[in-house]
């Protein structure tokens, strides 16, 4: 019983994504994003670099000048929850986004890529 209580408290404190995703699998999922984004260095491509993505305000990479008005005007801070929503269907989550990617339909893929982003912090 004590073990179950600890698991519940841990899940509530750290969120499901902290335990659900596999960063190694997430790195493989990220290959779908590499044509537009990088995570290794602060260099933009078609989309902004994703260095330091977790905890960053959306639309805040100063060197990236092609954000949509919707992205710049949003008050989103990227975390597991906001990334999951956005990566499910970017255009539905944020009307007016310029991101052409249709989204990651598989929940496991989203969990894994979020774990990958978290591992880069």
Task: Map each language-model feature to its residues.
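Positively charged n-region of N-terminal signal peptides that target proteins for export
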Residues: 1-4
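Bacterial N-terminal signal peptides
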Residues: 7-15
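Electrostatic cytochrome c docking/interface patches
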Residues: 14-30
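Residue-level signal for beta-strand positions within conserved beta-sheet cores that form or flank
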Residues: 16, 46, 95-97
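Gly/Gly-Pro-rich "capping" loops immediately C-terminal to redox-active cysteine motifs
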Residues: 23, 27, 41-79, 103
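The canonical Cys-X-X-Cys-His
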Residues: 30-39, 113
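C-terminal capping alpha-helices of c-type cytochrome domains
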Residues: 77-121
